[in-house]
Structure formats: C-alpha cells, structure tokens
Amino acid sequence: MNHSPNLAHSRQHRLTTSPFQPLPMDLLRAGSANRRFFLQAGLGGLAGLSTADLLKLQAETSRPGVSPNKKSVILFWLSGGPSHIDMWDPKPTATEQIRGPFGTIDTKVPGIRISDLLPRQAAVMDKLTIIRSVDCSASNHTPITMQAGHPLARRTDDGRDGGGYPSMGSVAAKYAGPIDPALPPFVALADSLKADVWGSGDMGSTFEPVQGTALAGLFQPPKGVSIDRIRNRNDIRRRFDHLHASLEASRSMDNLDNYTQLAVEMVASGKAVKAFDVSTEDPRLRDAYGRTSIGEKALLARRMIEAGVRFVVVSGAWGYFDHHGDHVRWMGIEKGLRPLMPHVDSALATLVTDLEARGLLDDTLVLMMGEFGRAPVINREAGREHWTNVMSMVMAGGGMKHGQVIGSSDAKGHSILDRKVTPQDIAATVFTHLGINIETQWEGTSGRPIGIVAPGGEPIRELI
C-alpha cells in the first residue's frame, strides 16, 4: 500500500491560523470568555455536566488499585503527514527525486545524521530517539490510528470514527487520572480539536480532551463573586441542585458533597489560570521556544505538565505537514518545509532542554509524530504524496534510553527494512511509562472486554 484513503476532513477544518503566527491572546491570557467545557456563565455554571463528568472521573481514578504518580506525556502532533525522508530519515546517496532538496548534518551522537533543517534537534540528539521503522499501514488522514495506538482505530466508510477505540490520552485520563485533581487529566492545545486530536471513542465523554482555548478561563470565579462566597458550601450546594439527576442512582449525597468540594477547589486554587500566565516566563526562554503558534503551545504544554495535567497534545494548524505540492495551501517540500521546520525544530529542542533544566524530563515522555510518512519520489508539483508504508517519529524523556536510532527503512525510504514498530507498541510504551498495566481491559458498548493495547503490542524494548 503506497497511499492513504481519501481525505478524511473537508476544507472547513482548515483554519486560518498559521503555525508561523503567535497564538491568539485568548489562549495565552487567563480569563478567556470560553468556559464551555466546565464552567458556564455565572456561579450556577459550576454545575455543568462536563464538570460533573470531570468530578466523577476523579472518583473513578482514585479507586483502589490506581497508584498516583507524576508521570506525564506531551505529544506533538504534526498534522498532515511529515516527510520522513526530509526530516529524520534522510537518503543522501539516493537520486535527487528521492533525497529531496535538503542536506544532512551530524548530530551530537556520532553516526546519527538528520536533515539540515533540524540543527536544534541535532544538538540535543543525545536526549532523543528517532524511530525510522514505524508501521503506519493502518493509518489514514486523521489522528485516529496513531493517537489511539491501535491498528483498528481508523476512519471507516460508515463514518463511525475510530471504531470506538479511545485515544492514548483518554486511556491516560481514565486509568492514571490527573496529577493534580484541580486540573483536567487530558488537554489539547490545538487549533482544531476535532481534526487534530482523537478523543475517547466509546470509553465515554468523561475522558474527552479539554481544549486549551477553553482552559484559560475555566476555573476563575464568575465576575463579582468572591472566593469566600464560593467556599460557602451551602450556597454552592443550592447552585448544584441540577447535578443530582446526572449522578448515578447509587451515588450518595456524600459523593455529591465530594464533587462539590472538588469543583470549589478547582476555582479557588487558581492553578489553571496560573498555568496560562506566561508573563512570568523569562522573555529569552519564550524567544527560544519561538513566539509562534507551535512554539507558544510547546511552552504552554510544559506549564500544563508542571501544573499537574497528565497528557497534553500539541498541534499547529490543521494539515500543516501535508506538502502535496506548490499548488496547495501548505506548498511542496522545499517551499513548505524550509520556512516551517525552524519553528518546529526550536519548539521540540527547547521543550526537552527546558524540561531537563526543571527536573521534569525523566517524568515526562515527549513524542513527535504524524499520521503517516510521505512518498519517496517527489512529484511534478515539487511535493510528496501520502505514504503509509513507513514513517519516522521522535521520542524524548520519560527516563528512557536515548541518543539512538531504532529501526530503518530501505535505501529509498519506501518500506520498513528492519525492526518494525507498530502503533500498539507505541501505546504500550506510553502506558508503561504512565504506570498503566498494558493488560488492562475496558468494556465497550457491546459489553465485551477490550484491551487498551491491541494484540501483539509491547513496550519498545530499546527504550525501556
């Protein structure tokens, strides 16, 4: 198979935000008006069903057998399908139509060379692992397969996205929960959550990602309402009356009291608001990340993890690695990648060194990948088509072994040559890092048990 199915999303998902532009200020400042995930207008909004879902999630993840830890994940999603040949798996001895317009450079690890578009990553190669043999044969032009880490999770002809399989972030939300209960466990920093971030499938809306643009103002008290007033539990209880019907019949009023108190703490702690206050960051660090959409999201991801979020997905504009040719929005390989890669390169390299400087890197697993690779031969429009035979990805942190390359593609970047790494292997590695038993099963809508890792999936042995 050398191409993916038809485009899975229509043009309506191609937003105007560019990965080169700074983030809109409503994502950067505390006090965003968009509170739709947890808090609606006024104090009464604290009782929205999404809040109830989150509070029930806390009760679920605090059940016996779940050991809280500080392990977290940041997933950079390179929407559109990044070219493995032009980034992490260069073919310098191949013909020009295969090797493309870019050169290669040495890295900090002797013997490992990557595209000359990635000098910052080359400088921290000892902290990175490149996997050049990722099996993306089940994937299509959506985030579903790779973000779920499951070959059966994909867009199907009947429109039932993902076959009900949840994303790795949703599994993390259910079985690891948040690091800090004052924050949601799964956050998406993406321009288009629907197009770029896969959610919970049939696992339930409780475990859906919270969109970052909504998070900045989630937990602020409504205008004119003091924290002292919010802390008045009798007042809060009256305003939560309509939550009663959403609680299971077996839930006692004691449980409702717990949910209420937790909601109060979410507001009173101010942790979500503080996490979005980047004004406290050193301007030089912000410059290093890049004051662009992808750079500022990477910085926010670090702040989310630092504050207590478990799983964060970072994505730039929808499809911004979909480099079919110079006639389309994101252009071809040279015109598309040359201006884009300095921003992506800086964002990843700075995040890794920043996490290390703060003592967070061993607890934070960082992944960078897309849905598939791109064709070995450059087309007549100076682009590369979709390619599902093989792709490359990068991992860092997580207390794992780095400074290595795992697997390889053939001389043309056409197919996997050795050490195939599957989506389920990636999922097993992520869940092992998070302390989640990879044999765990959940109950689908059919009532049958479903493994969180597809058959055959094992943690990547070279890393762990």
Feature roles, as predicted:
Residues 2-464:
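Ligand-binding pockets and gating/stacking loops
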